[in-house]
Amino acid sequence: MTNVLLGSYPDVFAAGSAWAGVAFGCFAGNGFDVWSDPCATGKIIKTGSEWKTIVDSAYPGFKGSRPKMQVFHGTADTTLYPQNLQEEIKEWTAVLGLPSTPVCTLTDHYEKGWTTYVYGDRFQATSAQGVTHNIQTKETVVLNWFGLN
């Protein structure tokens, strides 16, 4: 839901933190209760540019600064497969105009087995080794990301 809110309302939010989510637009459907197995299982693969087009179309003409974003995903998630983290990375680096390669990688960050890929001060992605869809939220990490520490 964080991906959807930040993609749809970039003028309302300053930052977001998505845990075990999917890229904005991945679950696009007919507007009713939609579950997309192709999205959930990581079979919807797009380029960063394609994802950016989807986000941009949610708020045509938006000229302001997009919210900063952090995403987390477990490598053992069988509800929303780990490929979805890669799609979120492609999406938000493109939307925020960041390089698609991290500027640094932090191993055992936040927890043992968690690797955080930092793409600048506006986007980071964390992969949690062996963690399922029930990924443990780290409130302090989120508050720090929001600058509320």
Model-derived features: positions:
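Residue-level "edge-of-site" marker
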Residues: W19, T105-L106
